Amino acid sequence: MKFYDLMSKSAEDVGLQLSKEQYEKFIDYMKLLQEWNEKINLTAIIDDEEIIKKHFIDSIKAFKRDEFKIASSLIDVGTGAGFPGLPIAIMRADLNVTLLDSLNKRVSFLNTVINRIGASNVTTIHSRAEDGAKDIKLRENFDIATSRAVANMSVLSELCLPYVKVGGSFIALKGPSVDQEIIESTNAIKILGGKILEVCEINIEDTELKHNLVVVKKIDRSPKGYPRRAGLISKNPIK
């Protein structure tokens, strides 16, 4: 229970309670992350405490936004090793969470974690984000699309907003400096049916980490031509 108090306080800060059972799931997740990371590149963060703070607590802090507390469905686009989607799913067993990633090895890792911790509310999809968004079973089918992927807001919006229902939200976990990104992505977000609602600052206890949650409301349907084909999105972002 070495990190229970730290994680419990972080959960309380965003209005949640961390049970001992949930904590044990996080520890199992961490052990599998470290074990698999020796075989495939999942994360550069391998120290126990660093994983707790920079992956688990960072993901849990998303609950500072009430959207994560009331949603029925969520997709994590380009989830990688499962952040933030899987920690969110552990904290809310009643939330249907979909983890989407383009690399089959990462999806295999996620399936192993899901089976180990008994996360029956989580499903995985092996697909590129731009391909998945064309699937009628996925397109405009989620209350929330989220991503912690390393891409600018214009690119992320094109990849994520098509998954969101009208009335839902795209919430990006971004670094400390987002002002210029937001200015440059405002028109792209508008074209894709979104509107920037708020930027919410996140602090991680006992670290110098400062992150931002960029909240985009889906107010209209995304045009059928988006997202565009692979490669074009990052090479030629919507201006």
Curated annotation (Swiss-Prot):
SUPFAM superfamilies: S-adenosyl-L-methionine-dependent methyltransferases. Keywords: Cytoplasm, Methyltransferase, rRNA processing, S-adenosyl-L-methionine, Transferase. It comes from the Bacteria. InterPro entries: rRNA_ssu_MeTfrase_G, SAM-dependent_MTases_sf. It is an enzyme of class 2 (transferase). One of its GO terms (molecular function) is rRNA (guanine-N7-)-methyltransferase activity. S-adenosyl-L-methionine binds at G78, F83, A129, E130, R148. GO terms for cellular component: cytosol. Pfam families: GidB (PF02527). The keyword ATP-binding does not apply. It is found in: Cytoplasm. Belongs to the methyltransferase superfamily. RNA methyltransferase RsmG family. NCBIfam families: rsmG_gidB. This is Ribosomal RNA small subunit methyltransferase G. It comes from Clostridium beijerinckii (strain ATCC 51743 / NCIMB 8052).
